[in-house]
Amino acid sequence: MELNPLKKSPSSEAVRNLREASCGPVGTPTVTNDLSENIILTSLEDLHNWARLSSLWPLLYGTACCFIEFAALIGSRFDFDRFGLVPRSSPRQADLLIVAGTVTMKMAPALVRLYEQMPDPKYVIAMGACTITGGMFSADSTTAVRGVDKLIPVDLYLPGCPPRPEAIFDAVIKLRKKVANESISERSKITQTHRYLTIPHKMKRVESKVNGQYLKAKTQLIALNPSLSEEFDQSLKEVQKISEELSSN
């Protein structure tokens, strides 16, 4: 039997090349522009923060005129739905508490109860001067809370009397940035200091200047500065004496 001279056995080099091609590591594929635009690399924490900042469900706690400015956001002129804000009527379905208006001692326990019923993570926006410091209603009132941060922790302060709808949008954008940079592990460690939950509110006593005495005072300056009363009486006597001398002559 004669072997075919044209049919030769493969060389060792060809066998080696075939083995490397079939058993070797796969080469790095080329990444096209279409592939890079359709793949996003992120972490689970960033994905969780992105989902929360895009769907903030606020609980509206309005007690005074600042709440009217927030009600203007519902209209088509501002359209707060584009931020994913869906107002809720139950604290158990909300993650954002917007306090707008004066908080009194009688309403303080109800506000704290609503905050405690909200699931974590939760955020608070103090809207308006009356909410942040007590405003003009705390000048001579013993029932107004001088700052809602004495009751619940506040994440963002929105000053104004009242703040405009554009300012409310700016506050929401700043809160979204805070949520985006937040860490789940660090959020549970945040605690509030100087928190008072008792009904007898701890606040600094401020003597009121508007106490009705200005109605009995001779001038408005004396009503604000009672120490000037003697000087005013003395100068008034001198003026009367001079006027009598002039009239006699």
Swiss-Prot record:
Cellular component GO terms, alphabetical: plasma membrane-derived thylakoid membrane; respiratory chain complex I
Subcellular location(s) per record: Cellular thylakoid membrane
Keyword NADP: yes
Positions that bind [4Fe-4S] cluster: C65, C66, C130, C161
EC number(s) reported in the record: 7.1.1.-
Organism: Prochlorococcus marinus (strain NATL2A)
Membrane topology: Peripheral membrane protein
Name of the gene encoding the protein in the UniProt record: ndhK
The protein's name: NAD(P)H-quinone oxidoreductase subunit K
One GO term of the biological process aspect: photosynthesis, light reaction
